[in-house]
């Protein structure tokens, strides 16, 4: 608990505040979309409902730009079609290992590496509109180096996609828009809490000595949303209460 003049921060032991599953998520690489993300596995009795991200949080450049891709095959023979799809996935993994700045992964929320050891676990999806068409999907990502904008990141990813050798009738193509990922959002908790505490202290000073500002919810897990083409906004879903000073 950090105590300031005219400020009370409700802050239980952070290490004990979150379920283990939520803590594990916060230590992983996380996909960040344009929508506010609430962590799974949080009981409703513990949750603080926030319609939109609070005003105080940490905006920073994401760790990776991420693009979903698909490998689509339409060879009539099912066995051959699937072999072509997986062979192209294998070639993509090998090419990523040779080219600098490109990594392959899977996951909708938590990002996991796609490797030669696990690529055949990719789920095969059938095309609802076309017979004898199947596909697999995964992620192509590139680290957002200092000064790199979204256009440069996308161009690097597109160049990689175009460079992957086709196999039979299998083809690789982009799917959807460029998104972002952040590695270990929980490591930014202390910086976020410091920002909230400083804002609460400043608010309390403006209110005068008769009142204090209490910041609630700082024991909640870090949450995230997209802030710009290359930036993420990390925050704790806190709320303020104005109470009589003691």
Stretches with model-predicted labels:
Residues 17-19:
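N-terminal signal peptide c-region/cleavage motif recognized by signal peptidases
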Residues 23-199, 208-246:
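Short, charged, surface-exposed interaction patches
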Residues 1-10:
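Bacterial N-terminal signal peptides that target proteins for export
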